[in-house]
């Protein structure tokens, strides 16, 4: 033993995670984790840094054909709630359990480990003792892996990527890496516009990770030991893989993004398409999710075991990024959902199992699922986690079936208070549906609710903003009238952040003075609704930076690099978000952020993500943008095919 285990106060519980970590430390790890171990109780939630959780997969380092680390550019408590990471970890380490036919073709064995963004106190500890960022399973430095894949499910994590690379002693800029450095890959929902972080990445995986990761692993295993240039050339032949260094951005005479084009002097063997097409998991219904996931030591953001029961959403709300990039809607069968839910509850010991989807009540067998799960879960005392629900699909029966032994809340997203604005964003729910849903839920015993609205839509009026207050007041009255307990309603009002590959990608961000005026009006009006109705909202500064990052081009990488050098963060403690310091970064990088965020865009305007084919045609998105401006809704995918480009009608 190379470090003495410190005394642990009784109130922290048994030091099992530290003892397991100490036992697992190998003299060959080369990262110096043993130097950290005696000091881990100096940091907050030390258990998140030791690994050794139940359900991990440990493989032999020396015999693995490929050593892959999955990086989540945010805290462990968030990353361990992210189902995508569990899915990919399970798929690489145990492919035969998830997709036997693909596993045989992909080869192996492959080794896959995890790494998360460390909190500031842990970063300081690592630097004090000279320990680079390491993977949790083997404790080996991240730089020792063949490849590191980062999942981005929100743009706020972008600023953490250069910091993680620096902590790992891996060159931040792709151009500075050598043959000895790992291949850095970006994936996840945000990589439908990878340009803001493209100069940090060697490769980008566009589309469903289950379709891509074994192909990536097989390619890199076959080329292991080859020069970096040859490995990237090999990856360029994998459908859905984009190699940013093979392309160059072209700007117009005013310094604005004009287009992205392949370099003229690409090395032999490179496959550089003008557009990269998203990979799609078509056989989602036959997909085998991880039923023995890694069980975290500490409480996570979701606090539940998670099961994805549906991918995509047929409703196509015009502001919704996930609703467009995950099209078409795909489902697990009722039998699979029920069996997998019960298996997850048994295997994890969790008293919560969350059914994850964008629009759960659009599942064609949802009533059957709830009817079969309710008695089984009641017997075992397990609660069912329900995501945001459509307000025109909750019957009295559904409201009763969703009730759980443990008190919780229901989440709804009306998005707008007036019918004309709901029609504009294609949120096709009527006022009567909203009222009846609340009545059903109150009669079924629900009394805690979360409501999500948005402001800042083009053409929005003061009446639209006031209607948020009026609708909340009416729903509060309904819940008081028909419920057995006084309701508690939390209302969140977010500013519209225009997202790539959505009809509102052409919309500007609301101006600062306009948003502040709307916030002021809402604060004043909500005070009259009482203490049991609470209002929260995102700031203009947060919306500004998110818009800049979500619709940005490669010039954003310099901004992010400057921010990392100055210790700026976008996520975590709101008090640490320094908008003026961020402004200084983009001004120093020569970026006109005001123009990027508030500028007008036409159909002919080149967009930084035009080279990424989401399978939904740009012409269709433009047509939907025109429908938004006319306040005209369009039918859901279930009602009528609108020929968006996916080819579902074939």
Q: Where in the sequence are the language-model features?
A:
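Canonical Radical SAM [4Fe-4S] cluster-binding loop centered on the CxxxCxxC motif
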Residues: 82, 298-335, 643-650
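Acidic, glycine-rich segments characteristic of secretory precursors and extracytoplasmic regions
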Residues: 2-198
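A glycine-rich phosphate-binding loop feature that marks nucleotide/adenosyl-phosphate handling sites
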Residues: 234-245, 358-363, 387-394, 456, ...
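N-terminal [4Fe-4S]-dependent radical SAM core
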Residues: 37-69, 76-77, 257-306, 615-627
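Glycine-rich beta-alpha loop elements in corrinoid/cobalamin-binding modules
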Residues: 101-106, 117-122, 126-267, 503-553, ...
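N-terminal pre-triad scaffold of radical SAM enzymes
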Residues: 68-74, 89-92, 293-319, 345, ...
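Radical SAM enzyme core and accessory elements
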Residues: 1-57, 64, 68-70, 99-105, ...
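Conserved SAM/AdoMet-binding glycine-rich loop
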Residues: 71, 77, 156, 342-450, ...
């Amino acid at each position: 033993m190379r470090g003495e285990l410190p005394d642990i106060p009784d109130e922290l519980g048994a030091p099992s995670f530290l003892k397991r970590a100490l036992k697992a430390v190998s003299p060959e790890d080369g990262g110096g984790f043993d130097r950290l171990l005696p000091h881990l109780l100096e940091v907050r939630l030390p258990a998140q840094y030791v690994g050794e959780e139940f359900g991990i997969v440990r493989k032999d380092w020396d015999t693995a054909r490929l050593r892959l680390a999955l990086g989540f550019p945010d805290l462990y408590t968030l990353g361990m709630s992210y189902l995508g990471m569990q899915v990919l970890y399970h798929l690489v380490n145990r492919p035969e359990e998830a997709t036997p036919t693909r596993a045989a073709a992909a080869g192996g064995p492959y080794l896959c480990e995890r790494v998360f963004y460390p909190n500031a106190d842990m970063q300081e500890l690592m630097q004090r003792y000279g320990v680079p960022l390491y993977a949790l399973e083997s404790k080996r430095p991240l730089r020792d892996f063949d490849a590191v894949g980062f999942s981005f499910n929100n743009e706020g994590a972008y600023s953490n990527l250069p910091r993680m690379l620096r902590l790992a002693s891996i060159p931040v800029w792709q151009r500075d890496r050598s043959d000895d450095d790992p291949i850095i890959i970006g994936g996840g929902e945000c990589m439908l516009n990878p340009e803001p972080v493209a100069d940090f990445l060697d490769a980008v995986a566009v589309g469903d990770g289950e379709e891509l990761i074994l192909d990536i692993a097989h390619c890199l295993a076959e080329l292991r030991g080859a020069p970096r240039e040859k490995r990237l050339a090999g990856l360029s032949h994998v459908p859905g893989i984009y190699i940013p260094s093979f392309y160059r951005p072209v700007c117009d005479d005013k310094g604005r993004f004009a287009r992205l084009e392949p370099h003229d002097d690409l090395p032999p063997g490179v496959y550089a398409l003008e557009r990269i097409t998203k990979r799609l998991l078509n056989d989602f219904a036959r997909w085998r999710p991880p039923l023995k996931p890694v069980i975290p030591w500490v409480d996570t953001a979701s606090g539940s075991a998670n099961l994805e029961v549906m991918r995509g959403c047929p409703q196509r709300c015009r502001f919704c990024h996930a609703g467009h990039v995950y099209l078409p809607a795909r489902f697990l069968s009722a039998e699979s959902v029920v069996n997998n839910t019960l298996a997850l509850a048994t295997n994890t010991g969790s008293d919560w199992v969350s059914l994850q989807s964008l629009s759960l009540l659009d599942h064609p067998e949802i009533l059957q699922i709830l009817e079969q799960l309710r008695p089984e879960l009641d017997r075992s005392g397990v609660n069912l986690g329900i995501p945001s629900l459509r307000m025109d699909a909750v019957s009295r029966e559904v409201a009763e079936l969703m009730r759980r032994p443990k008190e919780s809340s229901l989440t709804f997203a009306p998005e707008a208070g007036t019918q004309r604005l709901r029609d504009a964003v294609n949120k096709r729910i009527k006022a009567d549906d909203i009222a009846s849903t609340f009545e059903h839920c109150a009669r079924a015993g629900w009394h805690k609710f979360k409501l999500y609205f948005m402001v800042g839509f083009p053409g929005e009026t003061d009446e639209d903003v006031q209607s948020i207050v009026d609708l909340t007041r009416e729903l509060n009255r309904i819940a008081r009238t028909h419920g057995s307990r006084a309701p508690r309603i939390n209302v969140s009002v977010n500013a519209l952040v225009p997202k790539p590959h959505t009809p509102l990608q052409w919309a500007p961000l609301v101006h600062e003075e306009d948003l502040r005026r709307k916030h002021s009006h809402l604060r004043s009006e909500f005070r009259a609704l009482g203490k049991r109705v609470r209002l929260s909202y995102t700031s203009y500064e947060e919306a500004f930076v998110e818009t800049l990052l979500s619709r940005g081009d490669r010039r954003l990488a310099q901004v992010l690099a400057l921010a990392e050098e100055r210790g700026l963060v976008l996520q975590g403690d709101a008090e640490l978000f320094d908008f003026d310091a961020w402004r200084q970064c983009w001004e120093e990088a020569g970026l006109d952020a005001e123009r990027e965020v508030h500028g007008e865009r036409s159909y002919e305007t080149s967009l930084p993500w035009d080279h990424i084919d989401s399978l939904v045609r740009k012409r269709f998105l433009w047509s939907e943008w025109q429908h938004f401006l006319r306040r005209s809704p369009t039918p859901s995918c279930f009602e009528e095919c609108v020929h968006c480009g996916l080819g579902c009608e074939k």
